[in-house]
Curated annotation (Swiss-Prot):
It comes from Geobacillus thermodenitrificans (strain NG80-2). Keywords: Cytoplasm, Methyltransferase, Nucleotide biosynthesis, Transferase. Homodimer. One of its GO terms (biological process) is dTMP biosynthetic process. GO terms for molecular function: thymidylate synthase activity. Belongs to the thymidylate synthase family. Bacterial-type ThyA subfamily. (6R)-5,10-methylene-5,6,7,8-tetrahydrofolate binds at residues 51, 169, 263. GO terms for cellular component: cytosol. The gene is thyA. This is Thymidylate synthase. It is found in: Cytoplasm.
Length: 264
């Protein structure tokens, strides 16, 4: 995960000061890419401890098509609480767009089911794409998608994934995003009888909030440790039937947690 640390250094050295929606302010760079070979291990940042439970339950929540934080809260995950309304609703965010994209004709599209089926049927397709940036529904969302699209690519029996992210909270958010898309790639690869290949992140406005700068500098003093391995303990009949206990992270030995405030 040294490439992640190099991105932190890049922002600290080259970032432009910008004001932002949250009022916190950022150091920002534009247009950055990271690549991870999933054969080398599961890409969990080791220079600080990540809350794996939140990463797994959030992805399962997305895949359920759920947009209310109740499921997350029942499972000890609070990462979406700041944006939810008094009933726990977030509007048509990721889960709604992934599982029930509303078209102009009023019909809905299950993009996840469609892309899994297409990978199985036509792995050479260049249309293995899921999009969460539904312009017609952005104003109904409590937070428009930061990671707004992802594409799969099959070659030599391996499934690779590239995701696009318009806005990147590099200290708090990006380590979660990396792990989440790695997990999704492993799950879909298993469902499609494939091995995993490469995970690629492409970011637009890639930034450090000003109240994360000292934490990032602390993280840069730490030496990365070996990556853990992901074990999928069973193969469910569907991508939608995975449960929390189906996943095991083996050999995760991170440095201690570094606390930082969330910019809302």
């Amino acid at each position: 995960m040294r490439q992640y640390l190099q991105l932190l250094e890049d922002i600290l050295e080259n970032g432009v000061e910008k004001e932002d929606r949250t009022g916190v302010g950022t150091l920002s760079v534009f247009g950055r890419q990271l690549r991870f070979n999933l054969q080398d291990g599961f890409p969990l940042v080791t220079t600080k401890k990540l809350h794996i439970r939140s990463i797994i339950y959030e992805l399962l929540w997305f895949l359920k098509g759920d947009t209310n934080v109740r499921y997350l809260q029942e499972n000890g995950v609070t990462i979406w609480d700041e944006w939810a309304d008094e009933n726990g609703d977030l509007g048509p965010v990721y889960g709604a767009q992934w599982r029930s994209w509303k078209g102009a004709d009023g019909k809905t599209v299950d993009q996840i089911a469609s892309v899994v089926e297409e990978i199985k049927r036509n792995p050479n397709s260049r249309r293995l794409l899921v999009n969460a940036w539904n312009v017609a529904e952005l104003d109904k969302m409590k937070l428009p998608p930061c990671h707004y699209a992802f594409q799969f690519y099959v070659a030599n029996g391996r499934l690779s994934c590239m995701w696009q992210q318009r806005s990147v909270d590099t200290f708090l958010g990006l380590p979660f995003n990396i792990a989440s898309y790695a997990l999704l790639t492993h799950m879909i690869a298993e469902q499609c009888g494939l091995d995993v290949g490469e995970l690629i992140f492409t970011g637009g406005d890639v930034h450090l909030y000003k109240n994360h700068i000292e934490q990032a500098k602390l993280q840069l003093t730490r030496e990365p440790r070996p990556l853990p391995k992901l074990v999928l303990k069973r193969k469910p009949s569907s991508i939608f039937d995975y449960e929390y206990d189906d996943f095991e992270i083996v050999g995760y030995d991170p440095h201690p947690t570094i606390k930082a405030p969330v910019a809302v």
